[in-house]
A protein has these predicted regions:
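Extracytoplasmic/secreted envelope proteins and their assembly/folding machinery
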Residues: 12-15, 21-24, 73, 130, ...
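Autoinhibitory propeptides
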Residues: 1-68, 74-77
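Extracytoplasmic/secreted cell-surface and envelope-processing proteins
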Residues: 17, 36-39, 98-100, 197-201
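Surface-exposed intrinsically disordered loops and tails
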Residues: 50-56, 122, 203-210
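Short acidic, glycine-rich surface-loop motifs adjacent to enzyme active sites
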Residues: 177-207
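Solvent-exposed, acidic/flexible segments
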Residues: 11, 66-69, 126-130, 166-173, ...
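Short, intrinsically disordered, charge-balanced linker/junction segments flanking boundaries
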Residues: 6, 109-112, 184-186, 204-211
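Subtilisin-like serine protease catalytic core
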Residues: 26, 64, 74-169, 183-186, ...
Length: 211
């Protein structure tokens, strides 16, 4: 889509040689090593079942009751609009424990893909924000938590590198969107945006934020 290629190399001569190719218009630095690396996220222990006090008696939506009421989602559910037949891709930085949390076990997850380099050695052991996003849409656990689209199908796509902020992440995001399109996704949920980077010269100005 961007008519571009993301290349990783420690050889500066490679960059020089690439710019000599007739079909290469330009080359820019997309990633700079950060001064420090944060400690990897570690998955916390997850209980196989909920505690009795986790349930909210009297309302099948549980802890999600107020938010779905606010969005007037209950009448939609009552008329059958629960996301059935829709495929949703979630683009995020990680989906920690999404494969073990009880109220997420009934979600129809079609697959996962990791677009961050290097790829995670454990897809479900990264940051938890994507798990929260998945839960508010897809959770199906009556009287504990029911999301807004519990009958939809989902792709979980990791494209955010939490160790650094660089323009390379824009390419990770674009690759994830291209993948989502290729597998027939109907809706993309992306909680990501890019403006300020570790290399300040790469940061976008306000005027560049044109959508």
């Amino acid at each position: 889509w961007n008519n571009s290629v993301l290349v990783r190399s420690q050889n500066i001569d490679l960059l020089i040689n690439l710019t000599k190719l007739k079909f290469v218009k330009s080359a820019i630095k997309a990633w700079t090593s950060p001064d420090s690396i944060t400690i990897k996220y570690k998955a916390d222990h997850v209980h196989d079942t909920f505690n009795p006090w986790d349930s909210i008696e009297g309302h099948k939506y549980g802890a999600a009751e107020e938010q779905i009421k606010m969005l007037n989602g209950i009448p939609l559910h009552n008329t059958g609009y629960k996301g059935r037949g829709m495929t949703i891709a979630i683009l995020d930085g990680g989906f920690m424990n999404a494969n073990t949390i009880p109220c997420l076990k009934e979600i129809n997850i079609l697959g996962t893909a990791d677009f961050v380099y290097p790829k995670s050695d454990n897809f479900y052991n990264e940051q938890e924000h994507g798990t929260a996003v998945l839960s508010i849409m897809g959770a199906r656990h009556p009287y504990v938590y029911i999301g807004t689209a519990p009958a939809a199908s989902y792709w979980l796509l990791r494209c955010e590198d939490l160790q650094s902020e660089s323009t390379a992440e824009e390419d990770f995001w674009a690759e994830a969107v291209e993948f989502a399109d290729s597998v027939g996704v109907d809706i993309i949920n992306s909680s990501l945006g890019y403006q300020n980077f570790d290399d300040e010269e790469s940061s976008h100005t306000y005027n560049e934020l044109d959508g």
